[in-house]
Amino acid sequence: MWSRIVRKLNFLKLKSGVLPYTRFENEYAPVMQEDISKAAQKLKPYYEQYITHVSRADMAMSLELAAFVYALCAKKGYKTLLDLGSGFSSFVYRLYASENIGVQVLSVDDDAQWLEKTKGYLRQHGLPDAGMLTLDQFLQQPATKFDCVLHDLNFVEVRINYVQRVLEATANSGVLILDDVHKPDYLYQVLDLLKQKSVSIYDLKPVTLDSYNRYALAVLQG
């Protein structure tokens, strides 16, 4: 019982270090609700098709997160994008890339069959399926930095093992987005891992909370 109390107190301390979304807006990217709403309106037809024909809504990234990511990319003008856990995020990144010259996208998955399914979905919408790697292929690649990294790989029990790797793949001026932090054990592990790092952590709940109570965190270097 004492260990549970200590863990709970430690968890509260860790959560107290998470900065509010208003700080993210003011200090990094002024992504306003209007920007996110416009992005959601743009993405919604594609999203509804995706959760009807490709993946269940509770397994796919939320429309809220998709809209935020798209709006953030547009606001910051990112040129290098990485998503771990291919799917609708791979579509969002490539849709943005198709509208902006010189954007490079890399999508990674630990399920080769699902990666092929994502490729098919991209081709269906006239988007390139280049830059799609299995997790093993990605881990064997030379270290590369990305402006925007979305870590949504597999289930959180697997995902936690690669937080350090994706943090290393995030550019100094870039952002790492960690989804599904509504799960207390995962959130605790993430915050405990990051407490020794020179990072700032921001609560994206106000702009990414969905009907399943899922939401995300943003992590900035320095």
Predicted segments with their positions:
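SAM cofactor-binding core of SAM-dependent methyltransferases
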Residues: 58-131, 135-136
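C-terminal substrate-binding/active-site "lid" region of AdoMet-derived donor-dependent transferases
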Residues: 155-222
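Distinct, well-ordered alpha-helical segments
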Residues: 93, 142, 159-163
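A short acidic, Gly/Pro-enriched loop at the edge of an enzyme's catalytic core
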Residues: 141-148
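Membrane-proximal basic amphipathic "stem/tether" segments
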Residues: 1-52
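Active-site flanking residues adjacent to catalytic metal/cofactor-binding acidic residues
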Residues: 82, 108, 151, 178-180
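Conserved acidic residues
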Residues: 79, 147, 174
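Glycine-rich phosphate-binding "P-loop"
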Residues: 44-59, 148-155
